[in-house]
């Protein structure tokens, strides 16, 4: 998008902390991008079918959309189908195989991925250390990989 254009945010329920925080982080970053305009924000979606149904209405009401940020890979997959051939860039989160394939195929433009393995490992490690009485930080920042068509193969090779 070259740091300019019109975008939509399509998110899961704002009552779920993960979706709310993802939206907040995205909106905070957008303050640095004065030439990118958030045209519409919709929330409450987290499946394929709802996104496809809603996308026709969104495209009719906002015909100049250049991109969509969504808070769930599942939603992004539905959007990728609904916007196929439109040139609309899709950005999302979640490390799941079908979304990674969509990045490889160019249906999803960018994917923020955290290793589910690492999340599980660090969670159990925290619990075990806590039970042993080992003092540890309450927060642990895990690595996030930003995947595009250009680097997704490298990411896949690291996971092997």
Placement of each model-derived feature along the sequence:
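Hydrophobic residues at beta-strand termini and immediately following loops
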Residues: 41-42, 111-112, 142
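Hydrophobic alpha-helical
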Residues: 26, 39, 44-102
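Flexible loop/hinge segments that line or gate small-molecule binding clefts
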Residues: 6, 10-12, 94-109, 154-156
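Structured segments of extracytoplasmic/periplasmic soluble domains
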Residues: 1-4, 29-33, 54-61, 82-85, ...
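Short, glycine/charged-rich beta-strand-loop motifs at protein surfaces that mediate ligand recognition
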Residues: 88-89, 110-116
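Short, solvent-exposed amphipathic alpha-helices that sit
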Residues: 17-36, 54, 78, 119
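Hydrophobic alpha-helical segments within soluble ligand-binding/sensing domains
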Residues: 1-7, 21, 50-52, 96-99, ...
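Hinge/cleft segment of the Venus flytrap/periplasmic-binding protein
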Residues: 10, 14, 18, 29-30, ...
């Amino acid at each position: 998008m070259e740091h300019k254009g019109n975008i939509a945010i399509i998110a899961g329920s704002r009552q779920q902390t993960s979706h709310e925080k993802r939206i907040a982080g995205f909106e905070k970053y957008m303050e640095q991008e004065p030439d990118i305009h958030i045209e519409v924000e919709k929330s409450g979606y987290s499946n394929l079918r709802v996104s496809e149904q809603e996308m026709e209405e969104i495209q009719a009401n906002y015909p100049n959309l250049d991109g969509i940020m969504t808070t769930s890979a599942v939603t992004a997959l539905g959007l990728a189908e609904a916007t196929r051939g439109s040139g609309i860039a899709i950005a999302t989160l979640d490390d799941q195989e079908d979304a990674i394939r969509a990045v490889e195929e160019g249906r999803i433009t960018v994917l923020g991925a955290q290793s589910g393995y690492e999340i599980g490992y660090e969670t159990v490690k925290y619990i075990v250390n806590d039970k042993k009485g080992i003092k540890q930080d309450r927060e642990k920042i895990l690595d996030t990989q930003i995947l595009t068509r250009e680097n997704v193969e490298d990411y896949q090779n690291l996971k092997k």
